[in-house]
Amino acid sequence: MTAPRLIVPLLAAALGAFGGYALMHKVGPDVSRVSKDSAGVEVDRSSGPPPELNGSDPKSMLRPEQLSKALAIMGREGSGPGTKALSFRLAPGRINATIDADGKWVDLYLIPGGKVFARSVSPIAPSRLALEDALPLREISATGPSKMVRALRTRSGISPDDVNYLVADVDPVSHKPAWLLYLKSNANTYYRAAINGAHPSRCC
């Protein structure tokens, strides 16, 4: 890996420290309940952080209909059809992602129903290398997570409620997008599948 390439993970870490951590651990009441952000998207500011959900919940964001809504909102918040994600973490009750939006990084905390719970803009502008390695939203399959979970249930007895979260990422070797699935019971073991959810296999 060349020196410039090393900048990308460092940038991701810096952005996560700036906005991602705060969004993932947001607590406490909000003053207003509903407002609109600069992209015209409704921001849900209820009395506290949304409840965590299990994978089998009807509103689980692992479901294609929920993930499709979230991806559409991310496109509106970002740079339209060409929006890329520097990070993308999908849990049954939330999505935490950092996307590019017309020359800036935007940290999003999305909840079921295609709603934004929190949004912040990073002062760090996207570098060319960061954008090259980021994952285009159009490559994320809304049916991938559910397909992956169904396959793991059949092969390994893993149920939707066993799922802690998934990460959409670009494989550093093949340069192809993939899903990494982590379980609640074992943080050291994860499963990898193609971005469409096909061919899941255990890693570590």
Regions found by a protein language model. Give the residues of each.
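Positively charged n-region of N-terminal signal peptides that target proteins for export
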Residues: 1-5
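Hydrophobic membrane-insertion alpha-helices, especially the h-region
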Residues: 6-22
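Hydrophobic single-pass membrane-insertion segments
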Residues: 20-33
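N-terminal low-complexity, Pro/Thr/Ser-rich intrinsically disordered segments
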Residues: 35-77
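Predominantly extracellular/lumenal beta-strand repeat domains
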Residues: 51, 55-58, 62, 70, ...
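Exposed beta-strand-loop-beta-strand "reactive/processing" segments of non-cytosolic proteins
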Residues: 73-108, 167-193
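A short, surface-exposed beta-strand/turn
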Residues: 107-125, 188-204
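Long, charged/polar, surface-exposed segments that mediate recognition or autoinhibition
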Residues: 114-162
